[in-house]
Amino acid sequence: MTTISSFPSIFVPLVGLVFPAIAMASLSLYVQKTKIF
């Protein structure tokens, strides 16, 4: 049960850092592809 209790401490920063990075990258690629700006 130690790994389950320590899982959120690793999972939360991972989601908090990786998900915005993927969102920013996909957004920048979408803007470059569509050439809106």
Curated annotation (Swiss-Prot):
GO CC term, one of those recorded: chloroplast thylakoid membrane
Keywords assigned by UniProt, alphabetized: Chloroplast, Membrane, Photosynthesis, Photosystem I, Plastid, Thylakoid, Transmembrane, Transmembrane helix
Matching InterPro entries: PSI_PsaI, PSI_PsaI_sf
Keyword Membrane appears in the UniProt entry: yes
Sequence intervals crossing the membrane: 10-30
SUPFAM superfamilies in alphabetical order: Subunit VIII of photosystem I reaction centre, PsaI
Membrane topology value: Single-pass membrane protein
Top-rank taxon: Eukaryota
GO biological process: photosynthesis
Location relative to the cell: Plastid, Chloroplast thylakoid membrane
NCBIfam families given in the database record: PS_I_psaI
HAMAP family attached to this UniProt entry: PSI_PsaI
Record-stated family: Belongs to the PsaI family.
Described purpose of this protein according to its UniProt entry: May help in the organization of the PsaL subunit.
The name this protein goes by in its record: Photosystem I reaction center subunit VIII
Native organism: Gossypium barbadense
Taxonomic lineage from the root: Eukaryota, Viridiplantae, Streptophyta, Embryophyta, Tracheophyta
